[in-house]
């Protein structure tokens, strides 16, 4: 007989969803309040108010005390509305007492005890005191101390039908303070200050109430204490720095102890040299890479099918190695550290969770700096005086007045005589394309009178004269100008232009 298996309850399904199981949308939305009805209540709840109609998502029992029908009250003790009576006295508002200014000319009589004094020993009808006049009783009210406050408040009670009743309770006014003065008692107190009798009271100051006339007796004696600046402090360095550019020791030790030397980080010393050059070879088997950069963080991804043991047992299950950190220890060694993470637990989503391990390797000791004592090379027992005649000469250099020095113009005259005998005169003549257009006449050993015109400056060399003019042969070739026109008077049809082929080179 086949029986249908009962489906799990919505509560069990939602608990399974929270633990990572399958989440059914309708069950999840019901428990998290994301159904359509919940959305409508959230949207229209701010627009429409149904507070007095009892509409809600509760059990429908009317709250903790149930529903109360409209109209006449139900069974039970009938309720009676009590009138609210207004208190007869003025109720002071709660809060701090008002600040009353103090008059400096007022009497400074402050009672020593709180409350009313005991005046039972002196009755008003007892008659005058023995051996004195009548006793007068005064009531003193001080505005600075007699500040009214709330002495009590109304007592509020409630009955079974939750009706509030207010009981009229009036606070008791505070009793006025009374002081008894007896004119027969006259006590005089004298104070004698004599520094010769009592040398310890040289700096006694007598202060009198400012409402009466008084004098200040005594001098101000004080001790002169030299003040020193607190920001300038001298201290001695206990040990010399071990680095050329040392940083603050406090920040370095605090950051190192917080990150690497925490109680939640395991400490693992390493002695393999590959930890400095290529630490990935200690985690997984691989070849030596000459282009490996050791100053980076390393992430290792492993497949469960190809899981292998690490080359070094200390690096088993390591999935992350941080960048190297160089520091110095208290023993004076240089330490290279890397912060790693082991994959101790892997969830179904692929998240790896594991402890952190501090891998470190101590390289070498930092030798202390040798202090070399410097000796004096030469010690002169007495003062020596050296006199030099060259240093005794004083020379003044005045560059400002050196421009006005008089010079002789004969210094500018050239003493070398130039001779142009057996000279060769070459006259080059070329066009714009550097082609020779005019024949060069070679005038060798021909005395000529050559004139050179250069603008407004004309120089004539009269050392050479033409002896025989028949030596100059004139050319019979007629000289005609040559015009070169470089332009075209037509346009070629585009169809006659050769087609350009595109050749792609790979």
From Swiss-Prot:
The record's listing under InterPro entries reads: Late_L2
Q: What's the PTM story here?
A: Highly phosphorylated.
Family matches, as Pfam families: Late_protein_L2 (PF00513)
The record lists the membrane-crossing segments as none
Into which family does the record put it?
Belongs to the papillomaviridae L2 protein family.
Assembly and interactions? Interacts with major capsid protein L1. Interacts with E2; this interaction inhibits E2 transcriptional activity but not the DNA replication function E2. Interacts with host GADD45GIP1. Interacts with host HSPA8; this interaction is required for L2 nuclear translocation. Interacts with host importins KPNB2 and KPNB3. Forms a complex with importin alpha2-beta1 heterodimers via interaction with the importin alpha2 adapter. Interacts with host DYNLT1; this interaction is essential for virus intracellular transport during entry.
This chain's protein is named Minor capsid protein L2
